[in-house]
Amino acid sequence: MKRQRAFTIIELLVVLAIIAVLIGLLFPAIGAVKRNARQTENNTLVRGVLQSMVTYSAGHRNFFPGFDGFAFDDNTADTTGASAHGQTPEGRYWVMLTENYTTGDALISPSEDKTPWQRDAVIKDNYSFAMLNLATNPTVVTPPINDGNAYRREEWRNQQNPQVPLVTDRLVDNSEYIDGDTTTYLSIHDGSEVGKWLGSIGFGDLSVEFSNTSEVETRFSGYRNDADDIFTPGDGTGTGQEPFKNAEITYSVVNQPNG
């Protein structure tokens, strides 16, 4: 009968070293899987917001919540403050929530810890996603060529434009944030670092992509921008690590017809 040989210390150390290497390889892979799952879920939520907007538009002359083609919806003023109306994301989300086009849970990214809306006013803590910046009421007359707001308002309706971002992740400020300076940008997602924005971008045709840049090609109202920073000029004021900064998307208008 052969006597069984026990592991030597050296052999045991070799086995432990192999296990450590395998763990070192496995953990990043697990992290990547989790990160990809969150990104996929985030894309799904952004697409859900777009689909809710399209459903709303079917009964409102193809316009999305908050703007009817002539003026902003002021029915939201009772709950969001007189300055809000339908021009802010809060006002537009309020319309969608109170008229049951979406739910509070559907507005919060898996990468954020926020409070789902229950009742009354919609506040910054109730949503994760930016909406197209419609700015001031169009009753304030501005020559169209100088009014980027007019071009964006023209796109706030269901016309299946695949190059018009309508709903995206927000731009989050950091303590060194400089308005409109992409080198200071930050986002809520894992892998983001100062100067590297990551996030879901939802377009007018209901397509959604998870992008590692805030610069995309846009075509809207007869104009094209091949590298349009959707957060320029910046939409937030001041600095500081506030999780609701830049909750509106802004296009840069360039005198470059579609081609």
Located regions from the model:
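Short, well-structured segments within or immediately adjacent to enzyme catalytic domains
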Residues: 42-259
